[in-house]
C-alpha cells in the first residue's frame, strides 16, 4: 500500500523516523510474513494510517529482512507494535488487536478533531481570513461541548465579522473561570460595535418605519442597514413581519433581501436555520 505516512524501516532511515516522532507520533509495527496474526493486523494498521491522514506515521519493520534492527528492540513476540512520541516509546501491544483498541491507543496521543479544527481556524485568523475560520470554530465549539477557550476564539471571529449579537450569545456561555482579561476585552469590543451600529441613518430609518409600518420597501432598506452593522436578528425579524403578510412585498425585494441575509450567515448558523424554517413554513 502506497501512502505517504507509511514507511518501511531499514538501517538507513531508522534514525530519521525516530527523530520524526519528536513532532509526529510514530507507530512502529514489527511484522513477519510467516505470522498469521500479521495477515490480520497489517490491513487494519494500513487502513488506519490512511484514515488518520498524516496524523501519525506507520513505520513497518520486516523482522525477517531486518533481523539486526528487530534484535535492538528486544522483541518477545510477532507482531509487536510500539507507539513512539517525542523520541520515546509511550505505549504498545503484542499479538493481534481489534481496530477499536488501536484507535483508543492512538487517541491517547493524537489531537482530537475539535483541536485540529481550532488549530486550522487560528492559522486562518492570523491571515485575517475570518470568513473561512468561522465554520471551523463553530464545529470545534460544538464538538468540544462549548469549550471556553474555543468559545473565545469563536467570539473574536464573530466580532471581526461585525456580528456582535452572535458574539455576545457565545460569550454568555463562557464559564466564570474563563472570564479573564481577554474575555473582558471582547465584551468591551462588543459594546463599541453596538455603539457604532446605532448610526444616524439607522435611527432616521427606524423613525420613518415607525411612522409607516406597512411600507415594506422602507422596512427592507432598514433591514439592509441593520444587516450591514451585524444586527441580523433585528433585520430578519423586521423582514419576516412583512413576508408573513405578503411573500411578494416590495415587488419581491423583501424576500430577496431576507434570503441574501440568510445566505450571508451561512448554512450552519442557528439564527439563519431558525428563519429558514419559518420561511419554509410560509412557503409550504
Curated annotation (Swiss-Prot):
Signal peptide: none annotated. It holds the Pfam family TPR_20. Residues 2-111 form the Thioredoxin domain. Keywords: Chaperone, Disulfide bond, Stress response. One of its GO terms (biological process) is cell redox homeostasis. Changing residue 38 to A: Still fully activated as a holdase by HOCl. One of its GO terms (molecular function) is unfolded protein binding. One of its GO terms (cellular component) is cytosol. It comes from the Bacteria. Gene3D superfamilies: Glutaredoxin (3.40.30.10), Tetratricopeptide repeat domain (1.25.40.10). The keyword ATP-binding does not apply. The holdase activity is activated by HOCl, via the reversible chlorination of several residues in the TPR domain. Chorination probably increases the hydrophobicity of CnoX and enables it to bind a variety of substrates. Reduced glutathione (GSH) is required to resolve CnoX-substrate complexes. Disruption phenotype: Mutant is highly sensitive to HOCl. Disruption mutant displays increased sensitivity to heat stress, but not to oxidative, UV, osmotic and pH stresses. Mutation does not affect the redox state of cytoplasmic, membrane and periplasmic proteins, but mutant shows a decreased expression of several cytoplasmic proteins. Mutant displays overinitiation, hypermutator and filamentation phenotypes with the occurrence of anucleated cells. Interacts with a variety of proteins, including multiple ribosomal protein subunits, DnaK and GroEL. The reduced protein is monomeric in solution. Upon oxidation, its oligomeric state changes to tetramers and higher oligomers. Contains an N-terminal mobile Trx domain and four atypical tetratricopeptide repeat (TPR) motifs in the C-terminal region. The Trx domain lacks the canonical Cys-x-x-Cys active site of thioredoxins and is not a functional oxidoreductase. Chaperedoxin that combines a chaperone activity with a redox-protective function. Involved in the protection against hypochlorous acid (HOCl), the active ingredient of bleach, which kills bacteria by causing protein aggregation. Functions as an efficient holdase chaperone that protects the substrates of the major folding systems GroEL/GroES and DnaK/DnaJ/GrpE from aggregation. In addition, it prevents the irreversible oxidation of its substrates through the formation of mixed disulfide complexes. After bleach stress, it transfers its substrates to the GroEL/GroES and DnaK/DnaJ/GrpE foldases. This is Chaperedoxin. It comes from Escherichia coli (strain K12).
